[in-house]
Design a protein with these regions (language model features):
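Glycine-rich portal/gate segments that line the openings of hydrophobic small-molecule binding cavities
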Residues: 28-31, 37-79, 83, 127-140
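A general structural signal for short secondary-structure boundary/capping elements
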Residues: 7-8, 49-56, 66-67, 97, ...
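Residue-level detector of alpha-helix boundaries and kinks
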Residues: 2, 12, 73, 113-117
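Beta-strand/loop substructures that line and gate deep hydrophobic ligand-binding cavities in soluble
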Residues: 76-127
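Beta-strand secondary-structure signal
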Residues: 5-7, 49-51, 72, 85-87, ...
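A short, structured loop/turn motif at beta-sheet edges
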Residues: 10-15, 43, 64-69, 87-96
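Hydrophobic ligand-binding cavity/cleft-lining segments
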Residues: 1-43
C-alpha cells in the first residue's frame, strides 16, 4: 500500500472548489490531461457511481460525500485500485485542499511499490491538485 498526501492553499471558497470536484460533468474540463469524459451511472444517497473515459480506457469511480468538508473517491484501474480522500477546509475567504491517497498496486506492479511513492505524489499534484486550484481561482 502506498499512502501519500498533498496539501495546497486555494484562493477560492471551499464550497466553490467542492462543487467543481463533486460534479463529474466538470472533470474533462478540470482534468484534461487524464480524463476525456465522465458520465454518472447512478446515484444512491451520498454515493455517485461514475464511468470515466480515462486516457487508460474506461474506468469506474465511486464518489462518496462523507461530510460537509470531505469527499472520497474510489478508483479502479488496470494497474492499481486507489482511495482518494478530498478535504476542503475553509480558511477565511479561501481554503486548504488536502488530497490523501491510499494506492493498492496490482501484481506485478506491486513489486515496484517501494519506488513509486514520489511518482504518486507528483501525479497527485500535477493531475488533480494544480488543475483544480487553477480552475477554482480563475472563477473570481
Amino acid at each position: 500500500m502506498i499512502d501519500a498526501v498533498v496539501s495546497e492553499h486555494v484562493n477560492a471558497p471551499a464550497d466553490r472548489v467542492q462543487a467543481l470536484y463533486r460534479n463529474p460533468d466538470n472533470w474533462a474540463r478540470l482534468f484534461p490531461a487524464t480524463i476525456r469524459g465522465a458520465r454518472v451511472v447512478r446515484r444512491e444517497g451520498d454515493t455517485t457511481v461514475v464511468e470515466v473515459d480515462h486516457v487508460e480506457g474506461k474506468v469506474v469511480n465511486i464518489l462518496r460525500d462523507i461530510s460537509p468538508t470531505r469527499i472520497d473517491l474510489v478508483e479502479f484501474k488496470r494497474r492499481y485500485d486507489a482511495t482518494f480522500v478530498n478535504e476542503f477546509i475553509p480558511e477565511g475567504e479561501a481554503m486548504r485542499y488536502t488530497l490523501t491517497a491510499s494506492v493498492r498496486l496490482k501484481w506485478p506492479y506491486r513489486l515496484a511499490a517501494p519506488f513509486v511513492k514520489p511518482l504518486v505524489l507528483a501525479r497527485m499534484r500535477r493531475y488533480v491538485v494544480e488543475p483544480l486550484k487553477a480552475a477554482a481561482e480563475s472563477q473570481r
